[in-house]
Amino acid sequence: MQQAGSPTPPPSRAGEGATQVRSPGSDAPRAPAATDAGNGTAPAASTSRHDDYHRASARRLLLIGVACVLLVTLLLLDLTTGPSGMPFADVWRGLKAGPNGGDLDVATILWQLRMPQTLMGALVGACLGLAGLQMQTILGNPLASPFTLGFSAAAGFGAALAIMFGGALPIPNFVVIPVSAFIMTMVACGLVYLIARLRSASPEILVLAGITVLFFFQSVQSLMQFLASPEVLQQIVFWLFGSLLKATWTSVTVCALVFVACLPFIMRDAWALTTLRLGDANARSLGLSVDSIRQRTFFLVALLTAAAVSFVGTIGFVGLIAPHTARTLVGEDHRYSLPLAAIIGAVILVGASVFGKFISPAAVIPVGIITAVAGVPMLFTIIARRGSEG
């Protein structure tokens, strides 16, 4: 019972508890729980998304690291296999001794024969993997590759032309053939670009122009094979098989210079290529110059393809398999898929070289044949997946 004159406590309002909840064993009042769902969950959701992004990035970097380890392993394995046979201990001693040290026979086999072929396989595979991923991105076609636009057929025509008539020039064939193949590849690039510019640089126009150039160079190449003598025909067919046996330190240097020169421009456009996967309309709405990026990428693809096929011949399916494998592992972010596609392309070609030496040590099977045979099941898998998704 209250005494007269004492103040009456105000009635408690909704949301204002008259009694404070104290933690057990303590006189300090517990902080009131947040009741605003928006203020309480937004920071947590943002932190969760941030953590998910970092976990995904770490996973992608881990996969790239694993691919690098696999590539180094295959490079060493490729150096230890060959018709002459060489144990790993001799290879390791030869690598440490250098090209001018140690056993002369080991140094000659390792540094003058096997090393250029192994490095050339890695470089050509990396070029084709990068070119294939860029080609599929700018064309929006999962079955596109560096050969879709006729670049490979043009290189084959240039090589056949040099083999047939290069003897009339006072220049060695090992110089004339790759130079002619490179020039004809860039001519094909110019033809496709010219045809596309007559209408627009849309993916459909580029593909149609590429198919036109492809059939043109294939038909002329077939005519040259028909008219060639048996000896010349044998040389043309062997070049078209795609073999690393033609690799030299000069060809390795040229291919490496082209690859290193193109790589900064490719990685600079990684975000633009990722945006392009959203479609032309969405890319334009985000401020991307779609035609400019497509033309620039198109030229880089031509350079990479020319550097790859001019020295070793036609090698198929690497530019198709490597991009799909990279996208499956790391997704559409080209900051990760571009380097991974290059590494996977190198892994495929060096692995094909190792496999060819294992199954036929006396006469090494050209890597172009092995990649073509291995690429057929992959192509069927891609078609089946597209059919189930569509």
What are these regions (language model features)?
Residues 2-9, 13, 19-21, 25-390:
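Alpha-helical transmembrane segments in inner-membrane proteins
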